[in-house]
Amino acid sequence: FMPFEEWGLPVNPIQTRVIALFVFAALMWILEVIPIWTTSVLVITLALLGTSNTSLNFLKVDKFNSADVAAIVADAYGAAADAEVVKATQSSVSESLKKATNLTPDVVRSTINTAILKPVVSGKADAAQATALKEAAGRLYEGEVSARISKLDLTNLTQQKSIFATFADPIIILFLGGFFLADAATKFRLDINLARVLLRPFGTNPKYVLLGLMSVTALFSMFMSNTATAAMMLALLTPVLALFKPEDRGRAAFALCIPIGANVGGIGTPIGTPPNAIALKFMQENGWNVTFGDWMMFGIPFVVIMLLIGWFILLKMFPIDQKTLDLAKEMKGKFMTTPKAWVVYITFIVTILLWVVPKQYHGLDANSVAIIPIAVFSVTGVITAKDLRAMSWDVLWLVAGGFALGVALGETKLANDLINSIPFAEWDSLALIVGSSLICLFMATFMSHTATAALLMPIMASVAAGMVAGGSMDAPGAIGLLVTIAFASSLGMALPISTPPNAMAYATGHVEQKGMAISGTILCLIGLALSIGLMYLLGAVGFFG
């Protein structure tokens, strides 16, 4: 339905369906005609029904032209070959190619070669027959026969197992482990009690209490859902806001500090927000390894700088008239000391330590570590079946939909064809990073951050791989590109509709949309420039290898 061939990108019917799937996902995620997680379910369903090896019968597409392959086999043997032998080889090759999951000219050539030489390998061919068969096999690698193999129209399908595996991808388990930690912390009031303790050092000066609120919110957001963190902190803040005089603009600063802290804080760890996990997934697939600890080493400094900038912006835009504010005093409670509470405390500490300490010291990667709180909290009854049902499964399904798009892009060879057809060597890597992150930031301002990352990350990962292969970008540059896009996904916070934390803050009635738009736009643009500069610096000093 589009002139792909004229653009230098010849696509087969399956690849056309994958492109249509991307367009469909983009429109549904942007317009939100249905809940965004249900769009992911539809994406996975349509990929199974229309692009996989288990497609509906009327949608099935031949992976290769049987007549062309049969003719190549016959020409390799030559006119003097036994017709029955040729026919048997043609049948064997056809069956083998139908089962192949990664169909390329080299795979076709190797399959025919194996079938032709089978009598030689098994010892059933005499000397004369062996010589003739070796000559036939040799034709596959030179001359007209070899050229015809290279020009075969081959179609690769997505594999059913690969699509279903997105529901239990290691990154999904990593996120699920984060959910278990967050739910356990909330259930045993670890979050509220930690907030009370952490806010004490900030004293009673409203300016520093504001910074304390942003910092504590950001800290919780690194390990909990941004939305859940914002809901908890705004609930704690509501009675405090009532202490402000109606004309005190500082109320807006306190209301806005929560979504800023939640949105920015999630950037600090791989489990802080889904875009981070999605970026990590595609980096791992391409062999660009960034560990949990590595991410925190550049993510947390970025968060700290952004919090200080956000704090400065809020103080300048919304001066605080209130002279004193003892927020810690308003937060009642104490740490629970029940056996299950101690299980939560110890598991929380052990899990975070294992995530932060490099893998070579204990042998577990971040995904494997995530199973520890899942197992411990399940066995000890900290998390019950009721708690499990209440978890944010919609977020996991949304992320799985993004992974399914990546599977379709890779297994149908659309990503490979994209890489081979576009002159990436001529592209400027800095222009690509700036342009793609601006597009991402714009999209994230108006649609779900996770949906934005799920849509852009598979495409940009393929582009990055192409540029690395073309020599116009190195692996650290590719990592920087994906990390910048992940950061940009979380920085879209200029409007009430940008994120649930923004909507919650706006719903308090203490924030005007104009004030949110101005402060959010300034902060997100500064954050984008800072993230690009940070990735450039890390690449220059060899942080990514």
Predicted regions located by residue number:
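Juxtamembrane and boundary regions of transmembrane helices in multi-pass small-molecule transporters
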Residues: 1-3, 10, 66, 78, ...
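Membrane-embedded alpha-helical segments and adjacent helix-loop junctions characteristic
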Residues: 7, 38, 42-120, 124, ...
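Structural signature of hydrophobic alpha-helical transmembrane segments
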Residues: 9-20, 167-177, 226-230, 301-305, ...
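Flexible hinge motifs at transmembrane-helix junctions and intramembrane kinks/re-entrant loops
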Residues: 10-12, 24-42, 163, 227, ...
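Hydrophobic alpha-helical transmembrane segments
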Residues: 18-19, 38-41, 172, 207-215, ...
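Generic alpha-helical transmembrane segments of integral inner-membrane proteins
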Residues: 23-26, 45, 176, 180, ...
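Transmembrane alpha-helix interface/packing and boundary motifs in multi-pass membrane proteins
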Residues: 27-34, 216-226, 259-271, 354-358, ...
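Hydrophobic alpha-helical transmembrane segments in multi-pass integral membrane proteins
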Residues: 268, 274, 350-356, 402-420, ...
